[in-house]
Amino acid sequence: MLLPKPLKYAAIGGGVFVFGILIGWVIFPVILKSQIKKEMALSKKTDLRQMWEKVPFALDFKVYIFNYTNVDEIQKGAKPIVKEIGPYYFEEWKEKVEVEDHEENDTITYKRLDVFHFRPDLSGPGLTGEEVIIMPHLFILAMVATINREKPSMLNVVEKSINGIFDNPKDVFLRVKAMDIMFRGIIINCDRTEFAPKAACTKMKKDAVTGVIYEPNNQFRFSLFGTRNNTVNPDVVTVKRGIKNIMDVGQVVALNGKPQIDIWRDHCNEFQGTDGTVFPPFLTYKDRLQSFSFDLCRSFKAWFQKKTSYKGIKTNRYIANVGDFANDPELQCFCDTPDECLPKGIMDIRKCLKVPMYVSLPHFLETDTSVTNQVKGLTPDPNEHGIIADFEPLSGTLMDAKQRMQYNIKLLRTDKIAIFKDLPDSIVPCFWVHEGILLNKTFVKMLKHQLFIPKRIVGVIRWWMVSFGLIAVLAGVMYHFKDNIMGWAAKGESTTAKVNPEDGSNEQRGVSVIGQDREPPKVTM
């Protein structure tokens, strides 16, 4: 049976409608998801792999140092007053070297190489790195804190060590040029024959203190970042490639061949999350992203905050913080014991750095008031001092990230050492670092061409097909019924006869005759 022409059009429209739905909402998403899985895995010779191995643009590396303005008063127990100096801006170039693939377990091993270049033109107004800053003497404070924890009976010996190595300092503060403490290094004279200084220097070398370079003639050179610059980190990192399971891409599975570290207690030693340079795709607002920080020997969790956008691309913003160790059971394994956990927002990283220091968000953002009230001059701001990361959720591409961390030390009070006996016994800030990444125009354009332009084209096509198909169906059905109605009307008109009252015939012509016209009968009363 042949369909009427309007119904043919309706059938074609219905086919287009169904095809549009299948293409736009079923087939294309499957193809796109499959393509993303292929592109986002760390396969050899892919664009992502090349970018992952050697980031083709510099990251922002900004250092802010706290200058102490009331040193004499602090030595007498007064609350420290600080003034932030910075930023000192450096380009940070990141590369992974000695990269090896392991097909059998879908992993890659590599070592890390960072190179820093100072950019005075992008630093704070007039900052050259030659500014003299007064800050807590990290070495003196660290020596005393370490002995006070391990062998407090030896504090008198430590005082002799300090006087011998640092030439009888009058306080616990360091006067130093900014570039010296950041990269060039300050000299620690360990060329001493006296027992106390020599013993202290021997222990320092044995412990392989972070940030120290050991030079000839028993000269040590200490800096905050100098040992990282243009030096291959000896640690061998193992991560998943994500070829077998894209949701595993970048996941840290071993460090120096060991499946976990041996620093903290319980599950805090586990590698949870990626290496921080690549993340899995298909992110939702329910996901809690995790990455492992090799600098701090721990994993950080980030949670969804809000929808954002970056250069016209829709993104999800995730935020993170240091944590509340005293009240979060999941984090208490970072403490020596649950009873020794520090207040909210501050973490003891002594076991990680082998230096008695603490980390927090800059300016003690989101830190307990018992800590923040001990220092004047801080102005915490979530926008300036928080940890944030904006991801394109479909591909998991990191578009804009700002990792900020402040390093602090304790002004320990003890009667055993003269320059320590009146200190305020508080945790104080030393410096903080902003490490940021902004995906440049080249890679934003690449992402748009590979992902969003095809997605938008298919989006336009699918809605066009659905709209066209729906209109065609409605139009076909409408015209079909219109033709039928008109046909029925025409048929009814052709079978109806006109009755002529002058025609005396009683023949029925297409109508029923009920009766002849006649006068009503007369009724006689």
From Swiss-Prot:
Membrane side Extracellular: residue ranges: 33-456
GO molecular function: scavenger receptor activity
InterPro entries linked to this entry: CD36_fam
Key words of the record: Cell membrane, Disulfide bond, Glycoprotein, Membrane, Olfaction, Receptor, Sensory transduction, Transmembrane, Transmembrane helix
Residues bearing carbohydrate: 67, 105, 229, 440
Region span, Disordered: 496-525
A Pfam family this chain is assigned to: CD36
Membrane protein topology class: Multi-pass membrane protein
TM region(s), chain numbering: 12-32, 457-477
Keyword Mitochondrion belongs to the record: no
Hydrolase recorded as keyword: no
Subcellular location: Cell membrane
Start-end of Basic and acidic residues biased regions: 516-525
Cellular component, GO, one term: cytoplasm
Tissue spec: Principal component of the olfactory cilia membrane. Localizes to the somata, dendritic neck and cilia of the olfactory neurons (at protein level). Not detected in the axons of ORNs, the cytoplasm of auxiliary cells or non-sensory structures. Expression is universal among ORNs but differential between neuron and sensillum types.
Cytoplasmic-facing ranges: 1-11, 478-525
Residues of the signal peptide: none
An individual GO BP term: sensory perception of smell
Disulfide bonds, paired cysteine numbers: 268-333, 297-352, 335-341
Function: Plays an olfactory role that is not restricted to pheromone sensitivity. May be involved in the odor detection properties of the olfactory receptor neurons (ORNs) rather than their differentiation and growth.
Similarity section: Belongs to the CD36 family.
Name by which UniProt lists this protein: Sensory neuron membrane protein 1
Species assigned in the record: Antheraea polyphemus
Gene that encodes the chain: Snmp-1
